């Protein structure tokens, strides 16, 4: 059995059960483990409680229980500059961003990794549900987590080969109930702590109220694609393509009582387009354009790829043909897809392996751009 005691692994600890068990497993495997709590957002909940302070207390309790040193590091400036400014800019542009993808790329596997290296880390580890496989030549492949419902490779798709070579995902071969069971058996104080939901810096807050603190809302007209006025919308930034709830219009406005969905946006005229039916024609597209396209392994500057893709988290894979040119790609769907949303990630897979991905710029229906921003 190899001696892991000379290998230092710095674990990103959030105060949740996943990162707690990550640290526990590495400690049990004999690694030299250090726990780091990242404070990325100055956050207070509705009751005036700083949730980061509460989470840090949980990190301290777990680190003490399993016998590892721990530190807290503040990345609020890096987070604001690299993630939150991007988040706001995307909403200003009428898009629907995915800050978790950018947070992993810029904070958890860049700012945090850089800091860990100053502590002498050989690797960093997180509680993500993903796996890494290492070839003899050192090339790292990122694989889906075995818990299909928890697999987080979608959010890790922008990681580079260099970042992956320094990364361990100890939970990738486990299912979530097994992780909780390990925490309970070890008596960890976080064993029954509920999972966090929502965007990291918003937490459980009301999204509309949160966003309006940073971007002024601009109400405008809500229209059907054939020109009927359906009333006022609260501001384009509050709606995403394919959204059903929150429109304030019921089935009585249409002839068939089918539910209403957001089917388009016109940023220049501040119009929100709505239509009836889950598979409304305006929601269906046959291809997309992506930018910031990136692969986890070295690829040619220009190539074509047959693979599968996800266009949102937890979506089943769809067959696609990808034409890559530099950091841009045209992605052609084998079957029409619903509600392809500019700003979201498109992520490519070859079987179990996550190959990388990009950010969706536009969706197309038979060569015509969809009115999604």
Swiss-Prot record:
This enzyme's EC code(s): 2.8.1.13
Subcellular location: Cytoplasm
Major site of localization recorded for this protein: cytoplasm
GO MF, one annotated term: tRNA binding
Disulfide bond residue pairs: 103-200
Stretches for region Interaction with target base in tRNA: 98-100
Listed Gene3D superfamilies: Adenine nucleotide alpha hydrolases-like domains, HUPs, Translation factors
SUPFAM superfamilies: Adenine nucleotide alpha hydrolases-like
Keywords: ATP-binding, Cytoplasm, Disulfide bond, Nucleotide-binding, RNA-binding, Transferase, tRNA processing, tRNA-binding
Positions of region (Interaction with tRNA): 150-152, 312-313
Key word Disulfide bond present: yes
Residues spanning the signal sequence: none
Record keyword Nucleus present: no
Reaction catalyzed: S-sulfanyl-L-cysteinyl-[protein] + uridine(34) in tRNA + AH2 + ATP = 2-thiouridine(34) in tRNA + L-cysteinyl-[protein] + A + AMP + diphosphate + H(+)
Entry's Gene Ontology BP terms: tRNA wobble position uridine thiolation
Protein origin, superkingdom: Bacteria
Binding positions for ATP per the UniProt entry: 12-19, 38, 127
Gene Ontology CC: cytoplasm
UniProt-listed HAMAP family: tRNA_thiouridyl_MnmA (MF_00144)
Purpose of the protein: Catalyzes the 2-thiolation of uridine at the wobble position (U34) of tRNA, leading to the formation of s(2)U34.
Similarity field: Belongs to the MnmA/TRMU family.
Entry-linked NCBIfam families: PRK00143.1 (NF001138), trmU (TIGR00420)
Name of protein: tRNA-specific 2-thiouridylase MnmA
Gene that specifies this protein: mnmA
């Amino acid at each position: 059995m190899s001696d892991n005691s000379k290998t230092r692994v710095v674990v990103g600890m959030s105060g949740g059960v996943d990162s707690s068990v990550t640290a526990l497993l590495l400690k049990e495997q004999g690694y030299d483990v250090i726990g780091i709590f990242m404070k990325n957002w100055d956050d207070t909940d509705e009751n005036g409680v700083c949730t980061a302070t509460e989470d840090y207390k949980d990190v301290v309790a777990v680190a003490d229980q399993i016998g590892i040193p721990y530190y807290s590091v503040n990345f609020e400036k890096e987070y604001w500059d690299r993630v939150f400014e991007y988040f706001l800019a995307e909403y200003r542009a009428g898009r629907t961003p995915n800050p978790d993808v950018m947070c992993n790329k810029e904070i958890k596997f860049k700012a945090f990794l850089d800091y860990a290296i100053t502590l002498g880390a050989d690797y960093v580890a997180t509680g993500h549900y993903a796996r890494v496989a290492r070839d003899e030549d050192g090339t790292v492949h990122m694989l889906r987590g075995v818990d299909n419902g928890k697999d987080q490779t979608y959010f890790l798709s922008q990681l580079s080969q260099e970042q992956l070579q320094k990364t361990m995902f100890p939970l990738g071969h486990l299912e979530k109930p097994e992780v909780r069971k390990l925490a309970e058996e070890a008596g960890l104080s976080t064993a029954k702590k509920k999972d966090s939901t929502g965007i990291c810096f918003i937490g459980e807050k009301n999204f509309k109220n949160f966003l309006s603190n940073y971007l002024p809302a601009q109400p405008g007209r809500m229209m059907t694609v054939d020109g009927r006025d359906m009333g006022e919308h609260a501001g384009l930034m509050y709606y995403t393509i394919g959204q059903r709830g929150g429109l304030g219009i019921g089935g009585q406005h249409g002839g068939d009582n089918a539910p209403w969905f957001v089917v388009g946006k016109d940023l220049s005229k501040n119009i929100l387009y709505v239509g009836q039916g889950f598979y409304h024609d305006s929601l269906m597209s046959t291809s997309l354009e992506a930018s910031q396209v990136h692969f986890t392994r070295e690829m040619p500057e220009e190539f074509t790829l047959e693979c599968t893709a996800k266009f949102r988290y937890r979506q089943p894979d769809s067959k696609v043909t990808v034409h890559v040119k530099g950091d841009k790609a045209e992605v052609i769907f084998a079957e029409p897809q619903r509600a392809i949303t500019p700003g979201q990630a498109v992520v490519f897979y070859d079987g179990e392996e996550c190959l990388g991905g990009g950010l969706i710029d536009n969706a197309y229906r038979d060569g015509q751009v969809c009115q999604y921003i």
